[in-house]
A protein has these predicted regions:
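Catalytic alpha/beta core domains of metabolic enzymes, predominantly
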Residues: 128-145, 149-150, 173-397, 403-406
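Conserved, mostly hydrophobic/aromatic
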Residues: 34, 92, 161, 204, ...
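Active-site beta->alpha loop and helix N-cap motifs at the rims of alpha/beta catalytic domains
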Residues: 60-189, 315, 319
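Catalytic domains of carbohydrate-active enzymes, especially glycoside hydrolases
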Residues: 48-66
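N-terminal amphipathic alpha-helix/helix-capping segment at the start of soluble metabolic enzymes
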Residues: 1-37, 149-155, 291-305, 390, ...
Length: 465
């Protein structure tokens, strides 16, 4: 007989310092903050303002905008002017530190990506560095990053250091590999400079589309910060989680696994849908753990039986049952447990068994149906990602066991989908590139031909096996 260990459900926040984003405090002395990212063209000021208002009215507390260049930065300045009184805005900057310098003068927060802030765009090549060359690169990083820190100090601008698994620099990859340790070091390089420069107004994120890698890396970052006496607030999210029920369950597994241990000061549920659709999901996850009146503390029991986590709930809403079961079980399934058993008298057995499989797939333990990785899209995406996902799903849904990525652009696309079997990546207006794992096999083909070409590629590979 398998021993049963009942789990005591409690919630204790990890202590973190405070970051001030406009008038919004982020850190362990404040509620977990909810945020989203606009998917409009930042230069379309009317559409961007309208979408941001919808998001704030839906309950988000921050809205992030893609900020590719100086034109987008000036557009964001006008968007900021039109949204006075709604909430803080965040500029999302990749590849161009000069844009970050400018944006830091206009909005309450700037996000930079260590993988492409000073290092050149990733080309997936191993580059050998001597110790002297590596240190020279770190000194270059220090000099350039210090300039941004000084601007942020002058304008009371918060900074998010946001590492993505899909966009680690070739420099980091060459020394640490495609590993959680590499992601953590990519972040710590910047944190050490900030601490040396006495800049504390920082929030960190360290994300991946793989829930197991995401959770492991965040925990490793917390441990490394503790070793170096740093306690910055953390933003949580699963990149490219997808859409619909699968996207929600995957986000819940990843984010919930950390919230369950009190890790996380702000969250975003990244869905390939309208950004305002993300907010109720994020709120539900936050409230499940942080609200003492939540059903978690009055109608849920969790137990461990061998390699199985057992989750019993009185939840009467199916959408909430999906989120809460995935969030609660995520911690255990991304740890030592390999199976899940759900019990709820309000729902039939078939529904519960399917949810069990969906949660196991989100945790990377099985793949019983086609898995889709898709980004939430942003102003860099030049096609309607929701329509494309539906088209790709309709064409490939019968291909059980495959993992297919649909990515809006090249910022995270090739990297985040590296463990996908095939990838559909935006390459320009009306143009798509198709990937087999990391290899680009068809470049800049017309969008209207892309799904058929993807199917043909899969067919050829299947026939050649």
């Amino acid at each position: 007989m398998v021993n049963r260990k009942d789990i005591s459900l409690n919630y204790n926040r990890r202590e973190s310092t405070t970051s001030v984003v406009g008038s919004l405090g982020v850190g362990s002395t404040y509620p977990i903050r909810i945020q989203t990212m606009a998917n409009t063209d930042t230069n379309d000021i009317e559409a961007s303002v309208a979408q941001a208002k919808r998001c704030f009215e839906a309950g988000t507390e921050l809205v992030r905008f893609t900020t590719q260049g100086s034109r987008e930065t000036e557009s964001l300045r006008e968007i900021r002017n039109r949204l006075q009184g709604y909430g803080p805005l965040v500029a999302d900057v990749h590849f161009n530190p000069n844009v970050a310098d400018l944006a830091a003068q206009y909005v309450e927060k700037v996000r930079i990506n260590p993988g492409n802030y000073v290092d050149p765009a990733r080309v997936f090549k191993h580059i050998e560095y001597t110790d002297e060359e590596y240190q020279a690169e770190l000194q270059r990083l220090r000099e350039r990053f210090t300039r941004l820190l000084n601007i942020c100090k002058e304008h009371s601008t918060a900074l998010r250091i946001g590492v993505n698994h899909g966009s680690l620099s070739d420099r980091i990859m060459s020394r640490y590999g495609d590993t959680p340790a590499g992601m953590v070091e990519s972040c710590m390089e910047f944190l050490r400079v900030a601490v040396d420069e006495h800049f504390q107004n920082i929030v960190l994120s360290i994300k991946a589309s793989n829930t197991r890698i995401m959770a492991e890396t965040v925990r490793l970052l917390v441990a490394q910060m503790d070793k170096e006496n740093m306690h910055f607030p953390l933003h949580l999210g699963v990149t490219e989680a997808g859409e619909g029920e699968d996207g929600r369950i995957k986000s819940a597994v990843g984010i919930g696994s950390l919230l369950a241990d009190g890790i996380g000061d702000t969250i975003r549920v990244s869905l390939s849908e309208a950004p305002e659709a993300e907010i109720p999901v994020a709120r539900a996850l936050r409230d499940y753990f942080a609200d003492p009146e939540s059903i978690r503390y009055h109608g849920v029991s969790v137990a461990i039986e061998g390699d199985t986590v057992v989750y019993e709930s009185d939840q009467t809403e199916w959408a909430m049952m999906q989120l809460q079961a995935a969030a609660e079980c995520g911690k255990w399934l991304l740890g030592e447990q390999k199976q899940v058993r759900l019990a709820n008298n309000h729902f039939d057995e078939e529904k519960l068994r399917t949810l069990e499989k969906d949660i196991l797939q989100a945790a990377g333990l099985i793949r019983y149906k086609t898995e889709y990785v898709s980004c939430p899209s942003c102003g860099r995406t030049l096609f309607n990602i929701e329509e494309v996902i539906r088209e790709v799903r309709a064409a490939t849904g019968h291909l059980k066991g495959l993992k297919i990525a649909v990515m809006g652009c090249i910022v995270n696309g090739p990297g985040e989908m590296a463990d996908a079997d095939y990838g559909y990546v935006g390459a320009g207006r009306g143009r798509i590139s198709l990937y087999r794992r990391k290899e680009c096999v068809l470049k800049n083909i017309p969008q209207e031909e892309a799904v058929a070409a993807l199917l043909e590629l899969i067919k050829q590979d299947t026939n050649n096996k």
